[in-house]
Amino acid sequence: MRTREVLNQARDLLDDLNTFPVPNFNTGANLANSWTMAANVAKTLSPSLHPAEFMAALSRGVAKFPYGSVGIFLASGFAACAEAWGDIPVVRPADLLMAIDTMDQSFKEVAGADSWEFGLSHLISNISEQLSELELLTLTQVVDTALVCAQEATVDSADAHGGVGDAGLAGACLIFAALADLAAVAEGEAGVHVSTVQAMLRDWANRSRIVAESLRHTVPGGEFATTFHFEAVDMTTEKLRESLRAVSSEVLVCQIVDEFGVGHFVAHLHTPAPLTALPYSHGAVLIRHLNVLPEILEGDEDPLTKLTADFDNVVVLADFTARQTPLVAPGLLVLSSAPALVETYARAGATVLLGMDNPHQIGWAWHTLPTGRASLIVPTSSQSHQQALMMRDSLAATGSVDACVIVADTQDELSAAWLVQSLQGKRFRGALSEQARDLETACQDLRARIRVEPMSGQNLRTQIRDFANDLGSNRELHAVISSENASTDRMNLQLALSDYDDIELVAYYGGQPGVTCIGVRF
């Protein structure tokens, strides 16, 4: 619980740092969310469990809804502890060394042949090497050694990257510091490690701010971060990784054994082709585009150029300061079932939960959105709309979410696609409640300019004629074709439009469950 509090306090600090080799400024949120998931699982477990059973349960909990690469490593680390400890009733310092050795091998399997010189896998190897040189092991010695190794790796990473270190390593420093404080208190000492590490990281982040901001605004290409579960018979971790590596720049894979002894793969990829990279059979997929949506400051005019006899200095500077309130992009989450629209959503700045098979996955996906801004959940069916409302209310009841989460009234893929595209580039300012109010108003205005209907099977020509009366100057009719009747519906639409030489059919092929949707924008 203490570690969860420490990581939640530091999430913004860690988000301001970088994760190498790909610029990725969400490590703080991913670490905090992953550890919160583990803490929530821990609260449901019996105190009489053996350490291995406890760690195995934590591993399954984190792997069920992993947050980025750090979630993969954390789940793998818990699983390694469970594997190392077996049936021992109490963990001794020497058993911690055994767990770290197992974790060393596990992390190498997660990352495969990828060489992360300053990454978490390299860190665990160093910790294992340092601990092997100790003759007498105490709990404090083990954790303090891990903390020193993490601090050294963080500093080395910063030296190697122009002053900006690896946020994952910085997070490891905080985790080990929290554990070191617990060990110190257990042995009758004062716990000061967390405050020391927080001060170190804060000072380091402040000094590297200029370099970090430059990296933050460097878009790492047209890649997508993709996280998914996968089940396979007679499939090794290495074999799965190799099959994914052909279309991915970064591949992390771990295998988690459930309470029934069945192995499940969890993978996190950076890939330019998220759908091509996926295995044939997989569960829900969480996808976001690795772009950067920077804050914008309104008014870039130098106020000093306005200082004449007609202006009061204080008033002018105060006005300029007020106009410098940052404009921020809202967090967008789309609950989609249309693979063909995934890139459309993601390139417009939305996180996409594709193929949701568990309503609780909405909460998992929502927690990946940036903090400190209003967020919008965009359903694409009546079922996902109802599930989104229920999940929002459930999160609110537990204090996990405030009134700044809005659920759009979209209930089809076409309306969702148009809404997300229309919100692309829009920024909002002010407190969260003000952002939410303005975002909700913008959604209502945009939805008023969208008309979408299920395609009529009996009176399609009449329906097209009615649509034609509403078409704007672009004279475009759009459609999301049903996956069940794709060829037939596309042909029927084209035949019905043959009477209108000046109307173009623009179809999003790939479809949605259920009936085909057609619509126009005003």
Regions found by a protein language model. Name each.
Residues 1-522:
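N-terminal loops that bind phosphate or other acidic moieties
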